[in-house]
Regions:
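Structural signal for well-ordered, non-membrane alpha-helices
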Residues: 20, 89, 162-166
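A general structural signal for well-ordered alpha-helical segments in protein cores
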Residues: 5-6, 131-135, 161
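Rossmann-like dinucleotide-binding domain that binds NAD(P)(H)
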Residues: 1-62, 68-73, 152
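Generic structural signal for secondary-structure transition and capping sites
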Residues: 14-17, 62, 86, 146, ...
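C-terminal helix-rich "cap/oligomerization" subdomain common to oxidoreductases
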Residues: 136-180
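NAD(P)-dinucleotide binding in Rossmann-like oxidoreductases
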Residues: 42-49, 58-132
Length: 180
């Protein structure tokens, strides 16, 4: 249901106020393509395998997370942020801590076009890999500090995920109550 995408988007945008979602079963029967179960036929017709999640932040801000198991491959950016003066695009997987490409349309600076910043800042070790939340949590407990992914943030992402089935069933936008 997109836990990584939801966590990344809410880390950048903050807590959402509402969620809407469409979910579909696109491939009710799958055939495993590798490993010990290669060739095994698997029924996958109980829950959606594709979700398009829309988060409403108010004040004209929104985010969309397209997630699921129906994509075989994609060359689309892992994350794009569209703003009034340009776009920030992350083409590499988030676990590699990619340097974004930036499209800027600024009359003030007489710039229009794509650019890739040089010499990216080195990220702190606590946020530089996919399992960082576990190491960060242990570090926070040991040093009595707040983890990067706070319990309140995790609770907010969990609330979004819990409201998604209801939003799909009712075909409407659901209010969110938690924040971080």
């Amino acid at each position: 249901m997109g836990v990584h995408g939801l966590q990344i988007v809410t880390s950048i945008m903050g807590p959402a106020k509402k969620v809407a979602c469409m979910g579909k079963i696109t491939t009710p029967v799958r055939v495993a393509r590798s490993g010990a179960i290669d060739g095994m036929v698997i029924k996958a017709d109980k829950i959606p395998d594709q979700y398009v999640i829309t988060l409403d932040y108010g004040d004209g801000r929104m985010a969309m997370v397209d997630t699921g198991f129906s994509q075989k491959a994609s060359k689309a950016p892992m994350l794009e942020i569209f703003c009034d003066k340009g776009t920030i695009s992350f083409s590499e997987p988030y676990i590699t801590n990619p340097v974004p490409e930036i499209y800027l349309d600024s009359g003030e600076f007489d710039l229009r076009g794509w650019m890739k910043p040089g010499n990216p800042a080195r990220l702190p070790s606590k946020i530089n890999n996919q399992c960082c939340c576990l190491g960060d949590l242990v570090r926070a407990i040991e040093k009595d500090t707040t983890p990067v992914l706070s319990p309140e943030h995790a609770r907010h992402v969990l609330e979004i995920m819990c409201k998604i089935p209801e939003a799909i069933e009712k075909g409407c936008t659901m209010d969110l109550e938690t924040t971080f």
